[in-house]
Amino acid sequence: MKNSVLECRELTKKYGKKEVLHSLNLKLEQGKIYGLIGRNGAGKTTLLSLLSAQNPGTQGEILLDGQKVWENQEALKHIYFSREINPNSTVYSGLKVKELLKIAAAYLPDWDKEMANSLIHLFHLDIKKRISKLSKGMTSMITIILALASKAEFTFLDEPVAGLDVVAREQFYRILLEEFTESGRTFVVSTHIIEEAADLFEEVIFLHEGEILLKENTQDLLEQCRYVSGKTEDVERAVQGKETHGKEVLGRSQGVMVRLKPGEKMEHTEQVTLQPMSLQKIFVSLCSGEDETI
């Protein structure tokens, strides 16, 4: 499958009266690494579970190359969601790591046993252990192995580095990038460790309170955003007419994020300081509730 597109249209999910996702429209193209970023409870896991048909939506539709995904086994061969493993769940009661991997090999049509074995060796994972006895870091290693060895064209990972030490996290980022370069698969990585993984993401998706704040090329977004600081009156004068977010006030001083439109420029003056912003700082500013043109 080449140049495939996975998309959702007006996707809504409710649990009882609580709306977790609200009328989402999202298009994922093959051959990209997406970062899915949001606060706890933003709906990230729910979105990934819906896109992979592990969970039905309340309204809307999910399509792979124009074909509905729900109960479509042919389409689902190309999608895999490696979700967080809860070792205390009855699903894994008494199950050993090697048994889970055997189930995955039988269930996933493109399972790469050689890659799975290579990752087991890299992570020094004891496959004879029961999943209920594993640490958080070890269960994260299993989700990584399942995701990468699935060879699914659209692969979703939910907080894959949770509980991993810095060495193991760097190993994961390197392996993910190598696999992406070699295969051209699409990866969606949900993570709270934004800065560490930022260089991996070709595009970022900011999810906030069940809605998509933005979907943007990472480098373009970093170039669009600047942090402007100085005396309040100087800052307000400098950002007049610009889109601003995340205003911070300290006494007579002020700082604010400016997001420039294509072709729009920020004039340099001695009265204010302009600084580039990290992906994490941009996300925090956009979620702050401030959204205005001064």
Question: What positions do the PLM features span?
Answer:
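The feature captures the beta-strand-to-loop junction immediately N-terminal to the Walker
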Residues: 34-39
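ABC-family P-loop ATPase nucleotide-binding domains
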Residues: 74-77, 83-142
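Conserved structural motif at the start of ABC-family nucleotide-binding domains
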Residues: 6, 21-23
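Conserved ABC transporter NBD signature motif
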Residues: 59-71
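Catalytic Walker B motif of ABC-type/P-loop ATPase nucleotide-binding domains
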Residues: 155-159, 164
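ABC transporter nucleotide-binding domain
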Residues: 173-260
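C-terminal coupling/interaction segments
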Residues: 246-294
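Helix-to-loop junction immediately C-terminal to a conserved catalytic motif
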Residues: 52
